C-alpha cells in the first residue's frame, strides 16, 4: 500500500486523532457483538505505547433528527473499551465545544479519549455525512497534525470524520486494521494466487452487478448463490415459483451469463418451502426449477456438491453473501456446506467480505478457519468492484 501508516510517524507526546469503526450492535444499552472494538485495539494500543494521546472518533447507527440520538451514545463503547485496554477512557459525551477541548488539553501521554457519536452532527444539516468543511477543520484542530484512519467500514464514505479531517492535517495515515483490510482484499483481487474462486450470495443482483463484472475479469470461477440465483434462473426461462426476483434486472443477468465465458456457475437445485415464514413444507427440488407455490430459500445438496467440486484446489477464495436464509436452521446447509468446502482446501487464502457472510461464519462457528474476515461490508464490496475508496484516497502518500 503506497500510503503512510501509523508506523511511519512520530507519535510521542502528540494528540493523535483516530477514526475507528465502533458502529456496534446495541440492545438495551448492551453491546451484543464487540468484534469491531476488538479489531481496533492493535492500533489504539500502538499509539498509547508510543506515548501518543489517542483521540477517537466513531459513528454509531444513523442519526437524522434529535429523537434518533436516543440509545446511540458511545458511552457503552467507552466502558467496553476501557475494560479491554485495562485503563480509563475519557468520555466527555459531546462532539464539540469547551467541554471536549478542555478534556483533550488535559490528556497526558498514553491516555485515550472517545468523542461522542460523530453522527450527532447530522441532526443540524448532516454535517458529518456531507463532509462539512467547517466540521472537518474543527475536528482536525483538536490534534497535533496527525490523523490515523483505522475505520475500513466507512472508508467508502467521504465524511467529515475521515476525509474532512484528512484534508486539514499534516499527515493522514492508515492504522493496522485498514492496512490489513486493503492488503488482503486488494491483493486477493489484483494479484491472487490461482486458481482464484469468488463466491457471491445475498438476495439482490442489483447490489452485486459491479462486483460480478469486475470478478468475471479477475477470477477463474464465480459461483452464485442466495436469492439472486432466481433472477439468473428467470433470465434463462427457468421456473422459479414464488422465489425472489428482480424483474428489472433480467436483462442484466442474461448479459452477465452471456459474457461470462462459462466462468459463472449457478446452483443446480434449491431447498424450497411453501412460505417464507409459517411454512408447512420444506423439500429439495429435483433440478433448477422451483415448484409452483414454493420459493427457493437455500441452495440444495446437489449444488453444495457442485460448489465443493468447483472449489477443489483453489488457492484464493473471496466470499461475499450467504447461500440462503442462514438465520433459519432449515436453510443454513448451503452456507455451511460452502464454508466447509472453502476452509478444507490446503493452503488456501480465504477472505470473507464482511456483512452477512461474516455474521454467518461467526454464528455458525467457522470464523477462526478463515484467513481474513473483513469488518466492512460496503467498503469491501466497493474494493471488490475495483472502486477507489475516498477514505483511503485521502491518506498521505509514502
Curated annotation (Swiss-Prot):
GO molecular function, one term: phosphoglycerate kinase activity
Gene Ontology cellular component list: cytosol
Subcellular location field: Cytoplasm
Residues the entry annotates as binding ATP: 208, 296, 327, 354-357
Pathway membership: Carbohydrate degradation; glycolysis; pyruvate from D-glyceraldehyde 3-phosphate: step 2/5
Regions crossing the membrane: none
Keywords per UniProt: ATP-binding, Cytoplasm, Glycolysis, Kinase, Nucleotide-binding, Transferase
Family matches, as Gene3D superfamilies: Phosphoglycerate kinase, N-terminal domain
Catalytic activity: (2R)-3-phosphoglycerate + ATP = (2R)-3-phospho-glyceroyl phosphate + ADP
Highest rank taxon of the organism: Bacteria
Root EC class: transferase
Coiled coil: none
Cystines in this chain: none
EC number, as in UniProt: 2.7.2.3
Gene Ontology annotations of biological process type: gluconeogenesis; glycolytic process
Subunit structure: Monomer.
Name of the protein: Phosphoglycerate kinase
Naturally occurring in which organism (per UniProt): Streptococcus agalactiae serotype V (strain ATCC BAA-611 / 2603 V/R)
